[in-house]
């Protein structure tokens, strides 16, 4: 077997379409993913600045923390950083783009529309306050389409919101009289 055939066959054993699970590419979202996707609305996340009030026992606060600002977390050609996204983005970019559209609550037919990748990239950049221009996005999407989809998928995977549950500890009563 040639060098290329040896490495390709080893890679195919590691990744199979049926056994791979992309966090952004799952046929049936679990209840947790549905809860998280509902919390990811188009409204920007707010920072919790108010501390729990004394005497409010049993109240629970859920805070979503979303990383925003800065540049893209990975470069356009850093495709091999995530093997699953690389696999889906380079062999079936439409499938990966469908998954990104599902992540944003769009129809799975979204990638069939002209300019859909451009809109998804701009939406991701604006939602996470990533620096860049429309001209840069246009050039990247039209010249490096599969790489652009992979970069957006990696960005969404790295910038997913983290949920924290904040519970107030019940106050201990003084038992000494």
Curated annotation (Swiss-Prot):
It comes from the Eukaryota. Transmembrane segments: none annotated. Belongs to the cornifelin family. NCBIfam families: A_thal_Cys_rich (TIGR01571). PANTHER family: DUF614 FAMILY PROTEIN-RELATED. This is PLAC8-like protein 1. It comes from Mus musculus (Mouse).
């Amino acid at each position: 077997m040639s060098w290329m055939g040896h490495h390709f066959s080893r890679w195919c054993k590691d990744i199979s379409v049926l056994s791979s699970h992309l966090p952004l590419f799952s046929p049936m979202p679990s209840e947790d993913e549905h809860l998280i996707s509902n919390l990811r609305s188009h409204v920007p996340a707010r920072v919790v600045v108010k501390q729990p009030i004394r005497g409010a026992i049993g109240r629970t606060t859920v805070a979503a923390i979303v990383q925003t600002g800065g540049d893209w977390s990975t470069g356009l050609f850093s495709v091999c950083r995530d093997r699953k996204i690389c696999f889906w983005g380079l062999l079936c970019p439409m499938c990966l783009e469908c998954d990104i559209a599902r992540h944003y609550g769009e129809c799975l037919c979204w990638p069939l529309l002209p300019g859909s990748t451009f809109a998804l990239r701009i939406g991701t950049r604006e939602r996470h306050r990533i620096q860049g221009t429309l001209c840069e996005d246009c050039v990247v999407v039209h010249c490096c389409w599969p790489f652009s989809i992979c970069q957006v998928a990696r960005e969404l995977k790295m910038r997913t919101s983290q949920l924290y549950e904040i519970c107030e500890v019940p106050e201990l009563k003084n038992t000494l009289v």
